[in-house]
Amino acid sequence: VYKRQPWYGLDALADPRNILLGLAVLFLSRVLGLLYFMNNIDEQSIFDRSRRHLRWNAAAFVATFVAFLVTLLLARGWAVDPASGRISEEPYKYLHNLLAMPVVFVLLVAGILSVLWGIAEGLFRRGRRGIWFAGAGTVLTVLCLLLTAGYNDTAYYPSLTDPQSSLTIYNSSSSRFTLYVMSIVSLLIPFVVAYIWYVWRSMNRVRISEKELGKEDHPY
């Protein structure tokens, strides 16, 4: 997409939305880490420190994510004509996508509210289960943002120098054989998810504590 420019894609840093998204991901990672500590470490001093750091990290995340989401919904996008394949600019394209896909819109709102609920669980209720709400909400929100960027005849990776070279679901898909193989392999995903769930549940069955770490045969 940036092959004609000498910056090799680094000029994407000039787009404030990219900076806002990067900061939102950074602070969200810190928020999820703090919520994980609060849930899985049985030490009151660490719980209190995590809760204290959660305040400003959560505030920074909410501020940067809201700014990113607002600028995204108000930004122009690139629409694909399904008949001719021609790509043209469309104002408020991503907002139009959400309105055209009500299920995605509802799931996006649910994901955002779930993340906020997880943060509130740790901040105001002093609960330890905030990571479950925030983690599930993060997965749901990211999925909906990806669907908003690529579905509804949208160029998900637009070219700023040659719009007709933008990447879409139509022109970036693999061959029929590759898609067939990938669809077969994707049947393994539930087993992989179940394995990950089992391993993490086994690891987190007992909270980490000073006494637990003092054992020679601890499970870590």
Predicted regions mapped to residue ranges:
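Short, small-residue-biased leader/transition segments that mark boundaries at the very start
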Residues: 1-2
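Hydrophobic alpha-helical membrane-insertion segments
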Residues: 57-71, 133-150
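Juxtamembrane non-transmembrane "cap" segments at the membrane-aqueous interface
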Residues: 142-164
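Hard-cation-handling environments
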Residues: 59-68, 72-87, 94, 98-99, ...
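Hydrophobic alpha-helical transmembrane segments
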Residues: 9-28, 95-113, 172-192
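Juxtamembrane membrane-water interface segments of multi-pass membrane proteins
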Residues: 34-53, 71-90, 113-135, 152, ...
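Short, membrane-exposed interhelical loops at transmembrane-helix boundaries
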Residues: 87-91, 157-178
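Loop-centered beta-sheet repeat module
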Residues: 10-64
